[in-house]
């Protein structure tokens, strides 16, 4: 059992974060927030996928003023992503958002920061300090020579100090870079010094499969060291794909189990069925199952049921026919064309 780092408890809406709460899955909309219908539609898709917290970009006052309308029509907590303009943060709070992603050192004079913090305190809204290696202060780049993990942590500490001076402690922190090991080292260093909950992820990872690999290694490494309270997989793809990958990372690292885990053989010269097609059919048929079950789709009797005996349900194909098995025990033999349907029927019993 992995011992998680002890962090403070905060709440984003009704979702608990830190202090032993489950590692939460976040994503971010990729719509123009000002397009209310499109944004709500995408958030509802994220809700169906199991997303627990959603972040939306707030580029201007028009976007800020539609947040309340969006909030009314979604179920999960919503975080407003604010840069530079304190008035956008104040409007987002007024509209009823559940959290802010804002760097207080970037929004101007102290009185502006104080206004935002006072409003956040009154509404019990947490703030995520989001440090990105690509946008560190110039003096830190000069001090360290380039965007090092130490520079990232120092940048976060500057923002934290501003909030703590105003007696604000409802804080979550992220320290992201597109370089996996730089990100990991930044989180390691920060977590050795502070107990604020951490939102972890690798930024700008790119498309599938590159982004999935980078995110899985970076997030997985941190989780296995007990670091991380919320995660977001950043991909040049649908946010639903981000959520699906996030849950797979949590499943593999042993933190959360949700839905169907499919194990299937890579195929070899013994395989006489179209495994790729069968896996696709099984995934599609079981896509709405929420209970954690393991399903095996194997290409021959060598791989199934023997090598897949830990699966709750499974099939193993052969030329013209195949077997259906449960917990490694063969239930029946059916025609090859009936294998997938027989498996689905057994699961739904």
UniProtKB/Swiss-Prot annotation:
Keyword Cytoplasm appears in the UniProt entry: no
Sites where the protein binds [4Fe-4S] cluster: 265, 268, 300, 307
Cofactor-binding details, from the entry: Binds 1 [4Fe-4S] cluster.
GO terms assigned for molecular function: 4 iron, 4 sulfur cluster binding; 4-hydroxy-3-methylbut-2-en-1-yl diphosphate synthase activity (ferredoxin); 4-hydroxy-3-methylbut-2-enyl-diphosphate synthase activity (flavodoxin); iron ion binding
UniProt pathway: Isoprenoid biosynthesis; isopentenyl diphosphate biosynthesis via DXP pathway; isopentenyl diphosphate from 1-deoxy-D-xylulose 5-phosphate: step 5/6
Catalytic activity line of the entry: (2E)-4-hydroxy-3-methylbut-2-enyl diphosphate + oxidized [flavodoxin] + H2O + 2 H(+) = 2-C-methyl-D-erythritol 2,4-cyclic diphosphate + reduced [flavodoxin]
GO biological process: isopentenyl diphosphate biosynthetic process, methylerythritol 4-phosphate pathway; terpenoid biosynthetic process
Pfam families from the UniProt entry: GcpE
Family statement drawn from the similarity comment of this UniProt entry: Belongs to the IspG family.
Sorted UniProt keywords: 4Fe-4S, Iron, Iron-sulfur, Isoprene biosynthesis, Metal-binding, Oxidoreductase
Leading EC class: oxidoreductase
Keyword set includes Metal-binding: yes
Gene3D superfamilies: Dihydropteroate synthase-like (3.20.20.20), Sulfite Reductase Hemoprotein, domain 1 (3.30.413.10)
EC nos: 1.17.7.3
InterPro entries (alphabetical): Dihydropteroate_synth-like_sf, IspG_bac, IspG_bac-typ, NO2/SO3_Rdtase_4Fe4S_sf
Cofactor(s) the protein requires to work: [4Fe-4S] cluster
Protein name, as recorded: 4-hydroxy-3-methylbut-2-en-1-yl diphosphate synthase (flavodoxin)
Its job: Converts 2C-methyl-D-erythritol 2,4-cyclodiphosphate (ME-2,4cPP) into 1-hydroxy-2-methyl-2-(E)-butenyl 4-diphosphate.
């Amino acid at each position: 059992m992995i011992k998680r780092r002890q962090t403070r408890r905060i709440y984003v809406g009704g979702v608990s974060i830190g202090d032993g709460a489950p590692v939460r899955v976040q994503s971010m909309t990729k719509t123009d927030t000002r397009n209310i219908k499109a944004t709500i539609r995408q958030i509802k898709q994220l809700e169906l996928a199991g997303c627990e917290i959603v972040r939306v970009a707030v580029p201007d006052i028009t976007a800020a003023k539609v947040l309340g309308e969006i909030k009314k029509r979604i179920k999960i907590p919503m975080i407003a992503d604010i840069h530079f303009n304190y008035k956008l943060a104040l409007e987002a709070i007024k509209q009823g958002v559940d959290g802010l992603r804002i760097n207080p050192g970037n929004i101007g004079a102290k009185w502006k920061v104080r206004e935002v913090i006072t409003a956040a305190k009154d509404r019990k809204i947490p703030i995520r300090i989001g440090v990105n290696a690509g946008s560190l202060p110039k003096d830190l780049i000069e001090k360290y020579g380039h965007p090092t993990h130490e520079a990232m942590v120092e940048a976060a500490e500057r923002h934290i100090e501003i909030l703590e001076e105003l007696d604000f402690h409802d804080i979550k922190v992220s320290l992201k870079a597109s370089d996996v090991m730089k990100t990991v080292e930044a989180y390691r260093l920060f977590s050795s010094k502070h107990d604020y909950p951490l939102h972890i992820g690798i930024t700008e990872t790119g498309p599938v499969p590159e982004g999935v690999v980078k995110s899985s290694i970076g997030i997985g490494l941190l989780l296995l060291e007990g670091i991380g309270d919320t995660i977001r997989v950043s991909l040049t793809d649908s946010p639903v794909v981000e959520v699906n990958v996030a849950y797979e990372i949590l499943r593999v690292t042993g933190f959360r189990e949700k839905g169907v885990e499919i194990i299937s053989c890579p195929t070899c010269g013994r395989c006489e069925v179209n495994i790729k097609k069968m896996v696709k059919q099984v995934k599609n048929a079981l896509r709405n199952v929420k209970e954690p079950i393991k399903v095996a789709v194997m290409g021959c009797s060598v791989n199934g049921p023997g090598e897949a005996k830990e699966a709750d349900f499974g099939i193993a194909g052969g030329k013209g026919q195949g077997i259906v098995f449960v917990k490694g025990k063969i239930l029946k033999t059916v025609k090859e064309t009936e294998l997938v349907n027989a498996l689905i029927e057994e699961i739904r019993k």
